[in-house]
């Protein structure tokens, strides 16, 4: 999921394909805001993976049918370098475009994504002036802090690329207050695998699982680092320089990028290995006999010592030669990186269950231009 150069198909003053409003332009260039779930939102995760593509280390192929996100409050602020050790601090807002906009990232879009060949992005809106500063033109000599929000679905949202199924799914999102919805199928395709408990019977887990994950995780992403600024030197501890800078009489692209692997991580540390076994272990048959798992099935589940529905300890399973479980325990358990686990605790201070753990990791999935990390502010009860 690294940045690669590519052609950008962009409208300068008119935004087509049903995207949102744009401000009136002056002479300082413009910014095209787009959204992408990268190649993985389009094609999912194969197993075994091709080349160096990401994969689920426990042997699952994961494919998406829909990946709906509600974006809002795309904004620019002054002084992205205000606090070298606190990325969340910036100057005041100088421009903002408001939606909300509903996008199905699985459907892709007409633009080439920031990851290059095979990736797609959908145009959201165009900003052509500092609309919170009297429509002043953008200043090509200034870097602006970039941010956006993922918000609860709303019937008033501008639905940009939803088909009939997407419309129905989005209505469910709005009814339930979900911000993000994953719909898809996981199929176990592991072959040569090892386990920390050879006595455990993995045949007790279903081999095909439908998943439907509706996340209650409104989140603000601010002052994002920007891979497009490379090779500019970032602050210590950061990968890229912060902010976005325009060019005179040209369009600069700012892509809100959603990384789809975050809910499946084994730890809260960024880019952790992905697993599906803990989800499969909680799946239940629906009326048609199909195994289905939702986020509600994760409530009450101890993520530090997973068990299957029969109450048996779930071991680590590795179906990738390069993966070794992170600890020597037979029982699979995930690492919350210092955030306490407390089943009856305050959700603002502790993870109560696997539901909280998954939602927390999912809330970090917003980036700028493929891999630019943003300051994350969770707008729901959650540990910092």
Language model feature labels by segment:
Residues 1-10:
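Bacterial N-terminal signal peptides that target proteins for export
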